[in-house]
Amino acid sequence: MRSRRTLQNKVYNELDSTRFRNQLIPESSRSTMLELTPEVLSILKEHTEVFSKYLSCYIHALNKFIGFLRKASSLRFERTVLIKYVKKLRFINDSLIAYNFEAEFPDPNNTHLDEAVKPLASFLLKSIELLDLLNYFLTQPLQKEIISKTLNSDLNLSGECIVAIEDTYNHFVKFAQWMIESLQIENTFFQIEVVQFTRKCAIEDGVDLENTDNIFLQQVVPVTDTEEYEVIAEEWAHILADKTLQLETKFNENVINWQNKFDKKKEDK
């Protein structure tokens, strides 16, 4: 058995199955020639539904947050920035929902798997880059500005919520990486900035890439056949759905907390 950890055998211990732990890198590069199947196409649709739910979590929570920010006139600029992000996210989500797999791939059995994966992977990468910027603004400078301009932390996100934001994002990034690298799709436009930057820093710092817990550094093993891709893709759908549910729960807890604080202030007046 290989010593290096791969996505298939370790994503924070969630893919806990021997069929993932015992995979070897194939000698020949044939992943991009795999055929699409109706079953895999159905799972790709499931991935879009999960990602749409992920985006909807942000849209719903940010709309609530924007409403509460109206109560702090000193945060007008920050509120405007969030409104811009929500518009972008809503457009992305609407585009994702409108994507018709059946129309794009009417004959799955005569289509290469990578032909179906590339459009979705490209779309996810574009969305991920936007979410990277949003998450940074939402969890770092905005949190500081709230305290600086309101002199309290009533509108700050909880530490648990920030952890959930980062953890869920990391898993969606790793999923996008898996979609691409498991099929050995090599194209400059399919590189992920956060993954490339993490690798660069790890190499400069002398990190052992063969033995690391960093999710972005764990190697993705190319799949050997369509069935293997189908099984792992289905596992990913479950993992991402669970992560999205956890994020939604933390967002809702913050919304309830904000509501309770402002309701109490009304009662005290």
UniProtKB/Swiss-Prot annotation:
**GO terms of biological process kind:** mRNA transport
- Pfam families listed in its UniProt record: She2p (PF11435)
The UniProt keywords, alphabetically, are: Cytoplasm, mRNA transport, Nucleus, RNA-binding, Transport
Entry's localization field: Cytoplasm; Nucleus
- Keyword set includes Cytoplasm: yes
Gene Ontology MF: a single term: RNA binding
A Gene Ontology term for the protein's cellular component: nucleus
Q: Does the keyword Phosphoprotein apply?
A: no
Instruction: Give start-end ranges for the coiled-coil region(s).
Output: none
What functional role does this protein have?
RNA-binding protein that binds specific mRNAs including the ASH1 mRNA, coding for a repressor of the HO endonuclease. Part of the mRNA localization machinery that restricts accumulation of certain proteins to the bud and in the daughter cell.
Under the subunit heading, UniProt states: Homodimer and homotetramer.
Give the record's family classification: Belongs to the SHE2 family.
- What is the name of this protein? SWI5-dependent HO expression protein 2
Q: From what organism does this protein derive?
A: Zygosaccharomyces rouxii (strain ATCC 2623 / CBS 732 / NBRC 1130 / NCYC 568 / NRRL Y-229)
